[in-house]
Amino acid sequence: MSKNQGGNKHQGGSKTHLGHRARKRFGQNFLNDDYIIEQIVDAINPLPGENLIEIGPGLAALTEPTVDRSGHLKVIEIDRDLVERLQHHPFLSSKLEVIQADALSIDFSQFAEEGPARVFGNLPYNISTPLIFHLLKFADDVKDMHFMLQKEVVDRLAAEPGSKSYGRISVGVQQACKVTPVVAVPPSAFTPPPKVESSVVRLEPYAESPHPVKDKAQLHSLCLTAFNQRRKTIRNNLKQLVPAEQMEALGIDPGARPETLSVDDYCRISDWLTEHSLTKQAEKNDSQ
C-alpha cells in the first residue's frame, strides 16, 4: 500500500498539514493510505450538488478526493489549528464551508434546506457512539452516514441477537438505520497507528422503520437498563419496570438473557412502557 500524508494529487495541496501533531484530547489519528482512502470515497460515492458534511476532516485525507468529485463540501472541525489550515488551504478553501464546532453540539436540521444530508468522517473513537446517537435525532434530515470507527464498534452496530457483540447500541441503531460494514481498515493506514483495527460503516436511516417504536428515548433508556447486567435474565434486569407476566403477554420469555431478544422484542417492551406510563399519568390526573 502506498502511503502519503492525506493525498498528494495536487502536488503540495496537502502541505498545509505539515507540522501538525495529532492531539490526544481530540482522539486524532490521521488517515494516510491512498488505497484505503480511495476505497472509502468510492463507498461514499459523493456527487455534485449533494449536501455533503464531513465531521473531523483533520488533514483533509478524505476531504480532498471527496471535494474533487462533489465540488463543494461542509466540514465540521473542533481543532482551531486545523480549521485555520483548511481555511487557508491553497486548493480547498474556495470549495469548503468550514464550521469550527463540536459536532455533538450541532443541530443538523439547520442544513436540511439544502437537501438530505450525507454525513461522513473518520470519527475520534472517544465520541463515536454519542455522536451517532446525536445524529439519529436528526434522522429525518439525513440520507446516509459513512463513519470510520473501531472495528469492535462496527461489529456491535451490525450484531445480530445471540452474539456477544449484540447490545444496546445494536438495538438503538438498527431500529433507526440499515447498517452495512463497507471497508476494513488496518492500523497501518493511520498516523499515529491506533492499537485497534478500524472499519467503515454505512448507516442509512429508514424512511419507515421495519421496527417501529413510539418513543425512541424510552427504547434507549430500556436498553440501558436491560443490558446493564448481561449475565442476568430479562426478568431480573427489568423487574422494576415490567412484570414477568407482562413480558409473557408480549411473547417474550422472562428467563431469556438480554442479548437473545430481537430489536422488535425491545420495541414491544418499550411501547408497553410508553403506554403504561401514559395510562398511569392519566389515572393520576383523574384522581387529582
Swiss-Prot record:
Protein family according to the UniProt entry: Belongs to the class I-like SAM-binding methyltransferase superfamily. rRNA adenine N(6)-methyltransferase family. RsmA subfamily.
Bias type Polar residues, positions: 1-14
GO MF annotation, one: RNA binding
Signal peptide: none
Encoding gene (name): rsmA
Organism per entry: Idiomarina loihiensis (strain ATCC BAA-735 / DSM 15497 / L2-TR)
Record EC number: 2.1.1.182
Pfam (any one): RrnaAD
One cellular component (GO) term of this entry: cytosol
Principal localisation: cytoplasm
Protein name listed in UniProt: Ribosomal RNA small subunit methyltransferase A
Disulfide bond residue pairs: none
UniProt keyword Ribosomal protein, yes or no: no
Subcellular compartments: Cytoplasm
Function: Specifically dimethylates two adjacent adenosines (A1518 and A1519) in the loop of a conserved hairpin near the 3'-end of 16S rRNA in the 30S particle. May play a critical role in biogenesis of 30S subunits.
Reactions catalysed, as given in the entry: adenosine(1518)/adenosine(1519) in 16S rRNA + 4 S-adenosyl-L-methionine = N(6)-dimethyladenosine(1518)/N(6)-dimethyladenosine(1519) in 16S rRNA + 4 S-adenosyl-L-homocysteine + 4 H(+)
